[in-house]
Amino acid sequence: MKLKLIFKTIYADKDKTDLFYCVSKGIIYNKIKNKIVYQLKYTEIPRYFNFNLEFESYQSNKIYQSNTNTYKNTIIGSIYNLVLYIDIHNLFCDRFRINNKVLKILCYYLIIIQIRQLKTNKSYNITKENLPFKINDIINNPIQLIPWNLFLLGKNITLDLKNIKLVTNKQIPKKKFQKTGCIFESNNIDKLTHELRKKITTKSLIIIPTGFPKLWTNCSSITYTTYIDLVQLNDNFENKFKNKKMIHNIIVHECYIQYIPIIKKLIQYFVDCKSIWIINSLPLKYYISNDNNTEGKFTIGNVFKLANIWANFSTNDKKSYKTEIIRFIMADFNKLYFKINFPTDDLPVQIISPNILELNIFNEFRKFHMDWLSKLNNDKNNIYSSTSKHKNNRIKSKIYDCVMVLSLSVINNNDITIFFKNKIQKTLDINCKISKKIEKMIDVYISARKTSHHKINEKTPVDFTKIVNSLTQKKDKINSVISNYNRYQKNGFYDSIKDNDCPVCYDDDYIKTKLICGHTVCLTCVLNILPNSKGCPLCMEPININKMAIIRESIGESNNYSEMLDLLFKNLSNETLILTNLEETHNIMLYRGFNVWLLKCSFIAKKINFLSKITTVIILSSPLNSINDSDKLDFEMFQEYIKLVNPNISIKRIQLNIY
């Protein structure tokens, strides 16, 4: 019997690679390039282990064809696996007389495999059909940790990587998780709960946030708030749950990391509780956030706080099994976390026709985009001569975002100072923080230069003076930015800049665009400048679409400017929420006072009370034909989550019809 392990994955370019594995030398050779691709440190020992190069699959991508303006599914390469085969039968038979050198070599290769397992992306997805079997497997097979230095080779034998010896599996010390269960993530909690009720029904306690619907019938339930109140008021908790032995399952909805102490206290109270099930309606990153509604750090420590609900390790256990815990989270967290997605209904889409101004902006950006596409010839020897559908969709999404931002940046001339005020202050805050950090770094290096006894020479090439000078130059540049923006912040600054002919094309009848530096340039010139220099043509102040405003008075009737998009959002009530994945559009709408949430903000799901007061949700996203799969799934999950919290809410998608 042989154990098969993937030792290394090799990606080979199409038409440039013909791989060959030389057994005697332990090398993978590219015949076409006459080059060694990979070399093993030790050659194989066939009685105990051997390597084999095996074809896995072709790599393909949808590549743009400039001559037909279409995409063609093109093979761009191949994937090969260098597979390690371990003869378990021979190892077991020879375990008392095997050469120690063989074990050392095998340990070396298995350590590399373990390290690579930490970096490999895991699959967390399961299907509705596999859900009952997965639940049975979770209940009947509790998670257990084994020492990091032990590598299981089969049912009977294990290799001790630290002491370089073979041991039987009966000799392995194991640390079991005290509870069974897992975390389920789904885009439709109602349907998931319906499926789980078939397997987990009796003797269950349900923990839900305040305002969350009761999806479980014939089960006791409690909200986080109720439990906290009972504890703070020293109320008799036993009166609410008199028969604590009747609870065998605890089911937690929307488990935020700050609620973990509450859950652990409940687990300790219900001594007969065997399983804990967490059901989240959004990805895990949305539940790890700080109390001040800012995004928390997605760290191993935070993830293990969740895992320790089932493990229930003491402080000493955490110290003793620190390495094993890290390995579990990095390599085996898919034993505790599962995603199950259901089909969702398409949202109604309100199509808004672009006005002349929006079309002109779009056409200017599209001109550069199409010019770039037309020059792509898919040269095999030039990686920059082709583009994939995914990359091209990202560009389309960026252009769409730019059009939306500039359309919402049409401002009355008298409001320019107010319009730029928040933008300037934000830039000042960021640069001041960076300047202070650089000052601290300079102090550290100056201090190190004074205390160091090493002389600068070829053997010790750390030149503290050079580093300090480089940091000082960076600090001077940042201070220059701070000085400029302090000047821009002065009242009346934008009025002092004369608005004569466009200083670039000298046109006297143009749509005026005020830049954050105060200069006025025609819109066409700005849009032509952005793809190249990204700076004001007069003072070279860095600019982007967030650092400009289009003067409403300069548009004129000849451009047939319609404020349909602007009016649509202007007439929205406080009971309307805008959800978007367009970061720049989010920034401009936030400035203008809309209830707008950016899709990636981790604190969104915490505002259940706010969502209960909302009557309408508008989804403003990239065009449907260019939105990436990750954002599409996140929108679906938020859509179902919002409907779950507020069943009467109206959700629609608004899209500017330019693609």
UniProtKB/Swiss-Prot annotation:
Domain of life: Viruses
A Pfam family recorded for this sequence: zf-C3HC4_3
CDD domains: RING-HC_RNF222 (cd16564)
Keywords: Metal-binding, Zinc, Zinc-finger
Gene Ontology terms for molecular function: zinc ion binding
RING-type zinc finger locations on the chain: 502-540
SUPFAM superfamilies found in the cross-reference section: RING/U-box (SSF57850)
Name this polypeptide is given: Putative RING finger protein R311
Source taxonomy: Viruses, Varidnaviria, Bamfordvirae, Nucleocytoviricota, Megaviricetes
